[in-house]
Amino acid sequence: MDIISGFYNTINLAELSNAKTFGFNPNILEANVLNIAILLSGVIYLGRNFLTSALESRQQKVTEAIQEAEERLQQANVKLLDAEKQLTQAQTVIEQIKKEAEKTARTVKETILAQGKLDIERLTNNGKSSIEKAELQIKKQIQQHITDLAIKKVSAQMETFMTDNLQVKVIDTNIASLGGKI
């Protein structure tokens, strides 16, 4: 009804105007205003359902898109929390591995140093023992050589000083000293 009353107001304004160049045709049937009003009413009446359904469909799609986005956001937040937990666990494991590696390195270092000290002591003792053995062997060789030289010298002196008479005298003296023992 608002359209029709607005239309009548427009007609009344046109009748009031006395301008001959431009004007409003007050004859509704001639101006086709009635046909336009009926057509416009039909478009509004029929288009209202289409427009309403189109807007409702669009609203539903937007609502679904928002819900999907919220669900993806929640899933992303859950995945982020899981990833942060895994990162924290990985960092903890890395720290433990570093500590164990440092501890193992210290233990290996201490073991190697201790083994090195033992090896040095063993080599030192073996060296001392080898030196002592070499010294004893050299001393024995020197003593043997001195003994051999002394025997040769005494033998040489004996040959020059020992005559047959002196040999008989030495033998008789030795027999006499052994005299009662035989």
UniProtKB/Swiss-Prot annotation:
| Listed GO CC annotations | chloroplast thylakoid membrane; proton-transporting ATP synthase complex
Which CDD domains does UniProt cross-reference here?
A: ATP-synt_Fo_b
Q: What residue ranges are annotated as transmembrane?
A: 33-51
Key words of the record: ATP synthesis, ATP-binding, CF(0), Chloroplast, Hydrogen ion transport, Ion transport, Membrane, Nucleotide-binding, Plastid, Thylakoid, Transmembrane, Transmembrane helix, Transport
Look up and give the membrane topology term: Single-pass membrane protein
Q: What protein family is recorded?
A: Belongs to the ATPase B chain family.
What do we know about how this protein assembles, alone or with others?
F-type ATPases have 2 components, F(1) - the catalytic core - and F(0) - the membrane proton channel. F(1) has five subunits: alpha(3), beta(3), gamma(1), delta(1), epsilon(1). F(0) has four main subunits: a(1), b(1), b'(1) and c(10-14). The alpha and beta chains form an alternating ring which encloses part of the gamma chain. F(1) is attached to F(0) by a central stalk formed by the gamma and epsilon chains, while a peripheral stalk is formed by the delta, b and b' chains.
Name of the protein this chain belongs to: ATP synthase subunit b, chloroplastic
Q: Which gene encodes it?
A: atpF
